[in-house]
Amino acid sequence: MKCMSIKAEEISALIKKQIENYQSEIEVSDVGTVIQVGDGIARAHGLDNVMSGELVEFANGVMGLALNLEENNVGIVILGPYTGIKEGDEVRRTGRIMEVPVGEALIGRVVNPLGQPVDGLGPIETTETRPIESPAPGVMDRKSVHEPLQTGIKAIDALVPIGRGQRELIIGDRQTGKTSVAVDTIINQKGKNMICIYVAIGQKESTVRNVVETLRKYGALDYTIVVTASASQPAPLLFLAPYAGVTMGEYFMYKGQHVLVVYDDLSKQAAAYRELSLLLRRPPGREAYPGDVFYLHSRLLERAAKLSDAKGAGSLTALPFVETQAGDISAYIPTNVISITDGQIFLQSDLFFSGVRPAINAGLSVSRVGGAAQIKAMKKVSGTLRLDLAAYRELEAFAQFGSDLDKATQAKLARGARTVEVLKQGLHEPLPVEKQVAIIYALTRGFLDDIPVEDIRRFEKEFHAWLDKDENGQKLMEHIRTTGDLPNEEDFNKAIEAFKKTFVVSE
């Protein structure tokens, strides 16, 4: 029987080959241990090299955001359900900062602040992401606001106009029509090459559903993204929602497009941030808000801009909402946001309940930029309208005490009452700017002075219908639409006189 001989050289060659082919894959990760969890906040030991604002991952796959870097532990806000996280769990660094998906695929969808769809219409196919915290455009990258953003609401376009790239605060008590103003503005952007983003912060889910259905009904969802962090969601998501919305908008702005972002509302974001800060044991300041609550809103609203031509001439317009308590606009968050924005529209509950809708207080509302963006025709017809209306409100209060008023005062009161009627507008009935100009022209040139106040709304409706049918009326409207300026005033006056002859005053 032959004995098999084993050569030492062969064995050593084989071992050598195995050693050469051996690959050791060592994965180094920075891992910490959860030492405390509750109320959407976790504290972790370890994670020595974690950065402020970095994403971390818990053992059950839930993500968190490192906000507090302390001597012995890290304060983490949990971006999701925290019930599955317990003391002793592992938490690891990801090396990434918070990002959201961006792109055309988001248009027409309802997403949460992490960019995940919540409308049941399947996954969203996006290829790009952007960090939610990014620097605002610099001084030299901006341009003065000069293009109008037509809201379709007479009281806003005439009294407190908004330009593309502006930040206009909408402030008022609850139930004064703030959301309606935003929804009507979004509906009016149809066909104007505008992307709209509606950010619902701490709203009831039924309210968000109603807004989405309204936008769908008027065909506005075709150019709108809805970002929602409802009242039932954890505070971190409410805090992040506005940043997610503006990040999605910036993608389009830097591509040279025009974007409108509505934040409904920032009071709830500030309250969510206060909750997080107190749970993280940061020192409280005025009204228990943390010291950096101003920076919370300023870094968000500074990202709204009109970009220079060199940067693509895109724009991002912000309409932040702030809810007041009993009309107190001198509270902490309202004064903060007023100082950051380029003007405010103050909606007053007294006006709302007396039937003046939209309930805009002309005296306290102002636009610090938009006048430069008004079309020439609107600027000519609405020049002193805001001041006249504010003066009328003062006279109205004074007139209740005086019985014998001089003729000039009576004329002012009569014109003021008609102005209030003209500026009233139904829900979801935005008007094209040329029709707004037509009725305000008729008002300011005295054509409505002999029409009874109760007939003004009907006069306006029939006048607009007449302008659509009449050949001369169509030409006048086309002139305003194409040139942005008033047509020949004599022709305009003749057209209004011609319509007035056909209008029947009610008995």
Curated annotation (Swiss-Prot):
Its main location: membrane. One of its GO terms (molecular function) is proton-transporting ATP synthase activity, rotational mechanism. Keywords: ATP synthesis, ATP-binding, Cell membrane, CF(1), Hydrogen ion transport, Ion transport, Membrane, Nucleotide-binding, Translocase, Transport. F-type ATPases have 2 components, CF(1) - the catalytic core - and CF(0) - the membrane proton channel. CF(1) has five subunits: alpha(3), beta(3), gamma(1), delta(1), epsilon(1). CF(0) has three main subunits: a(1), b(2) and c(9-12). The alpha and beta chains form an alternating ring which encloses part of the gamma chain. CF(1) is attached to CF(0) by a central stalk formed by the gamma and epsilon chains, while a peripheral stalk is formed by the delta and b chains. Produces ATP from ADP in the presence of a proton gradient across the membrane. The alpha chain is a regulatory subunit. It catalyses: ATP + H2O + 4 H(+)(in) = ADP + phosphate + 5 H(+)(out). It comes from the Bacteria. Gene3D superfamilies: 2.40.30.20, ATP synthase alpha/beta chain, C-terminal domain, P-loop containing nucleotide triphosphate hydrolases. InterPro entries: ATP_synth_asu-like_sf, ATP_synth_asu_C, ATP_synth_asu_C_sf, ATP_synth_F1_a_nt-bd_dom, ATP_synth_F1_asu, ATPase_a/bsu_AS, ATPase_F1/V1/A1_a/bsu_N, ATPase_F1/V1/A1_a/bsu_N_sf. It comes from Anoxybacillus flavithermus (strain DSM 21510 / WK1). Its EC number is 7.1.2.2. It holds the Pfam family ATP-synt_ab_C. Residues 118-141 are annotated as: Disordered. NCBIfam families: atpA, PRK13343.1. It is a peripheral membrane protein. GO terms for cellular component: plasma membrane; proton-transporting ATP synthase complex. It is an enzyme of class 7 (translocase). CDD domains: ATP-synt_F1_alpha_C, ATP-synt_F1_alpha_N, F1-ATPase_alpha_CD. HAMAP family: ATP_synth_alpha_bact (MF_01346). This is ATP synthase subunit alpha. The record marks 365 as: Required for activity. ATP binds at residues 172-179. Belongs to the ATPase alpha/beta chains family.
